[in-house]
Amino acid sequence: MLKKKNRITSSVAFKEIFAKGNVKESECFRIIFKKNNLDYPRYGIVVKAQNSKSAVQRNALKRRIRNILRDSLPVFSKGFDIVITTKKDSINMDFSELKESLNELLLKLL
């Protein structure tokens, strides 16, 4: 689990990032990011019901993404608000492929 300070929780913050953020994409992720005035990054994860009808699969994917983010958190000392949305292909990928794809995309932000 990410620390509370590293999570985006309010719908207002999500809407602002979606409206004013920049976008980077890969085959299985879409990252929308916006600079914040904090000394640490904040993350939000969105897995649409269109990707999988099963809530169990969607929540498992969110847990995997949080685990990857927890490992890469020390790399991002800059202040960014980052929303990670998944694409349909990401549901069936194994952990190592997810980690490689997400880390590759996050490194583009540096």
Predicted segments, located by residue:
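Positively charged, solvent-exposed patches that mediate nucleic-acid binding
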Residues: 1-110
